[in-house]
Swiss-Prot record:
GO MF term list: ATP binding; D-ribulokinase activity; ribulokinase activity
Annotated family: Belongs to the ribulokinase family.
Keyword ATP-binding annotated: yes
InterPro entries linked: ATPase_NBD, FGGY_C, Ribulokinase
Protein name: Ribulokinase
Length: 563
């Protein structure tokens, strides 16, 4: 191992990018910096009422440069010379259209303010109808079922649905695009100067989980399948968009001269392959086979790795994909998740905080006091509910405020609140929100357990896991399993740094690198036997309400007029 080697991990989240410098020999986190996306902060290019969420590529470029330069300037001159690799993770599926030169269309002047020419963020649900069409065609029997390895349901959050939707609604983008690229693949290509479609190295993680790529059918779905969806997928775009994929421990190139100068780093820095944030977060958390890693933030992503012999040729139903090498090369990566977790709490906070915002506008002299109350609202609600949970009067809340990802994706579903009375107050209702997110977490655990993929350990990471012990204890009690909290606040970036260390040759493989670099555990929560018993009937009630409510969100049948 190169003595003193340092790698950088870049974690592109929904709101900001984080840069982390890690000492490869010890896993010590040297420096970190977050940089927000300015256009996103201003709410530009997003229409929440329509479930439209877009990121401008310039936001990624500007934020990345600020964050990395800040970290690099904190390193000593020798440490800067010791940087041997950069790893990248991102949200996903977050794809964007590119031209023949590999430019994201929004970086061209004529598309600079066109949301359809930007990255379509993972939680954008404008492509529901297109996703349903893909699922229906997969189940039609006319073609092999390309959805079999992604849980049997194609989601509006994923690659092909978003391509179809944008192509249907925007002729200019459709005509200018020759391919589409995931954010986690684009950033390594940008840094290494390999953005042209023919030079792009597509990551196994994104391709297998979101693009219907699988070695069984030698890559992407056949042209006849895509033509049946819409001929534009093979006529307007290159076919195939790609064929080969790479695991994230393999290098895609080295830092280009331009980016070496912009970041203040040597040109021989290796750029490793990209993957989704939660998959790399699982590696940063030190995940082993049959450990369920819950990356908890605005939503959750639940990751497990399993040996190929146990999975064999089975298809795991209801999840978001099973992909060889998507997490750890040589193991099957399994993905699940909840479409909203922290976002639900944030929605409730905005709802209750509306009068405070209005009062601050009407009384500017008191605006700081009103803002303080608003900022501490969720913390105060959590404390109040924990002091007096009153589980016998817990409202029913279904955690579908942003649809359902797992089990069995359905983005038509909406949040549901029931079983209220005149005695229900704000803390009690917020307690219902906490319980709902824990119940959703349990359905994912049971989805794996019931398909002979036993959950042997549960790890939780992310801001909520580290800062909300009440919420984590409820999850622990509802799932009736020990729940370990990972110490690092930057597990996703840490995982990216681990992959960079392997790509740069510091370690031979990911498990070897994890032994030195992965995060330790902060604590392990144990289920409270009394609360386990009290939550059990409430969980069953949640499942009953799910069965009752889901059919109500099905699309209305088309009416047939009689003349």
């Amino acid at each position: 191992m190169y003595k003193g080697a340092i790698t950088l991990g870049l974690d592109f989240g929904s709101d900001s990018v984080r840069a982390l410098a890690v000492e490869c020999a010890t896993g010590r986190e040297l420096h970190k910096q977050a940089a927000a996306y300015p256009r996103w902060q201003d709410g530009r290019y997003c229409l929440p009422a329509r479930n439209q969420f877009r990121h401008h590529p310039q936001d990624y470029i500007d934020a990345m440069e600020r964050a990395v330069r800040d970290v690099v300037t904190k390193l000593t001159p020798q440490q800067r010379r010791d940087v041997v690799g950069i790893g990248v993770d991102s949200t996903g599926s977050t794809p964007a259209p590119i031209d023949r030169q590999g430019r994201v269309l929004a970086l061209r002047p004529e598309f600079a303010d066109n949301p359809n020419a930007m990255f379509v963020l993972w939680k954008d649900h404008t492509a529901i109808e297109e996703a349903e069409a893909i699922t229906q065609l997969c189940r039609s029997g006319e073609y092999q079922d390309y959805s079999r390895f992604v849980g049997g349901v194609y989601s509006s959050e994923w690659f092909w649905a978003k391509i179809l939707h944008i192509s249907h609604v925007d002729e200019a983008v459709r005509d200018a695009a020759v391919s589409w690229v995931e954010l986690c693949d684009w950033v390594p290509a940008l840094l290494s100067g390999t953005t042209a479609p023919g030079d792009l190295k597509r990551g196994r993680c994104a391709a297998g989980h979101k693009s219907l790529w699988h070695p069984l059918w030698h890559g992407l779905p056949q042209a006849s399948f895509l033509n049946a969806l819409d001929p534009l997928l093979t006529r307007s775009l290159d076919y195939p968009l790609f064929q080969d994929t790479w695991t994230a421990d393999r290098p895609v190139g080295t830092l280009s001269r331009e980016w070496a100068a912009r970041l203040g780093l040597p040109e021989d820095v290796v750029i490793s392959g990209g993957a989704f944030d939660c998959h790399m977060g699982a590696v940063g958390a030190g995940a082993r086979p049959y450990t369920l890693v819950k990356v908890i933030g605005t939503s959750t992503c639940d990751i497990m790795i399993a040996d190929a012999q146990r999975v064999a040729d089975r298809t795991i139903n209801g999840i978001c994909g099973q992909v060889d090498g998507s997490v750890v090369p040589g193991m099957i990566g399994l993905e699940a998740g909840q479409s909203a977790f922290g976002d639900m709490y944030a929605w409730f906070s905005r709802l209750l905080g509306w009068p405070l915002v209005q009062a601050a506008r009407q009384q500017p002299a008191l605006s700081q006091q009103f803002e303080h109350v608003r900022e501490t609202l969720l913390e105060d609600l959590t404390t109040a509910w924990a002091a007096d949970p009153q589980l016998n009067h817990l409202p029913v809340v279904l955690d579908w405020f942003n649809g359902r990802r797992t089990p069995f994706a359905n983005q038509r579903l909406k949040g549901t609140i029931a079983d209220l009375n005149l005695g229900t107050d704000a803390p009690a209702l917020f307690g219902g929100f906490i319980a709902a997110t824990a119940f959703g977490a349990r359905t994912i655990m049971e989805c794996f357990d019931q398909q002979d993929l036993p959950v042997q350990q549960i790890l939780a990471l992310g801001g909520i896991a580290r800062k909300s012990p009440v919420i984590m204890q409820v999850c622990c009690d509802v799932m009736n399993r020990p729940l370990s909290i990972v110490a690092s606040d930057e597990c996703c970036a840490l995982g990216a740094a681990i992959f960079a260390a392997v790509a740069a040759g510091v370690y031979q493989n990911i498990p070897e690198a994890q032994k030195r670099m992965a995060s330790p555990l902060a604590q392990t929560l144990q289920p409270d036997p009394e609360r386990v018993l009290r939550f059990q009937p409430l969980y069953q009630r949640y499942l009953d309400w799910c069965r009752i409510a889901e059919p109500l969100f099905a699309p209305a049948p088309l009416s047939v007029s009689k003349e």
